[in-house]
Amino acid sequence: MKKFFIIGTNTEVGKTYISTKLIEVCEHQNIKSLCLKPVASGQSQFSELCEDVESILNAYKHKFTAAEINLISFNQAVAPHIIAAKTKVDISIENLKQFIEDKYNQDLDILFIEGAGGLLTPYSDHTTQLDLIKALQIPVLLVSAIKVGCINHTLLTINELNRHNIKLAGWIANCNDSNIKYIDEQINTIEELSGYKCSAKISRNADYLDFIDLSKILI
């Protein structure tokens, strides 16, 4: 079983969009996948579920339950450690790790774990998402929304991954804003300064077919 932890350079960079398209291409190719969203925030306007959890379940056509893919949910779209403190919820690294590792014995080809926001998103006053990734020791798939500031955010994230000896399986350029100029130049700069080639350049309104080459790299 291949395992990948999907993080963004920031929040709202398209992690869940990328996750759902990877799910769709796996389903299309009869690749047995499971995408977890261990920590989620921001309730959907259409149900009691968090929006990201609902999107993942929809991509699977509800063959999984919310409890199978999500451990901790908050209705408010607020940084996890803040809303956890307000609601007296303990976001335990050990509990999250156990929730994820419990899936390792399932008959899967690939396991995706979609994180909450960026690499250093706090889970508490003394832990961050990085601590969970280090505990799991699995490669990271990084999503960067190409726009002003993305070069700095992407390089900082890659540098931090390297500093902690966490493998970067690849990075995806999410080019979802057609108004952004010099997209290729920004991608080229990230490639040159980081030493990592872009694994996939995803344009606005892409469908799962645009992810087939990426799925081949991952699997």
Swiss-Prot record:
Cofactor entry: Mg(2+)
Record: residues binding Mg(2+): 16, 52, 114
Keyword line: ATP-binding, Biotin biosynthesis, Cytoplasm, Ligase, Magnesium, Metal-binding, Nucleotide-binding
Gene Ontology molecular function terms on file: ATP binding; dethiobiotin synthase activity; magnesium ion binding
Annotated pathway: Cofactor biosynthesis; biotin biosynthesis; biotin from 7,8-diaminononanoate: step 1/2
Residues engaged in binding ATP: 12-17, 52, 114-117, 174-175
E.C. no: 6.3.3.3
Group of enzyme by EC: ligase
Xref: Pfam families: AAA_26
Active-site residue numbers: 37
Keyword Iron-sulfur assigned: no
HAMAP family: BioD
Protein's job: Catalyzes a mechanistically unusual reaction, the ATP-dependent insertion of CO2 between the N7 and N8 nitrogen atoms of 7,8-diaminopelargonic acid (DAPA, also called 7,8-diammoniononanoate) to form a ureido ring.
Family: Belongs to the dethiobiotin synthetase family.
UniProt cross-references to PANTHER family, sorted A to Z: DETHIOBIOTIN SYNTHETASE
Protein known as: ATP-dependent dethiobiotin synthetase BioD
Organism whose genome encodes this protein: Francisella tularensis subsp. holarctica (strain LVS)
Encoding gene (name): bioD
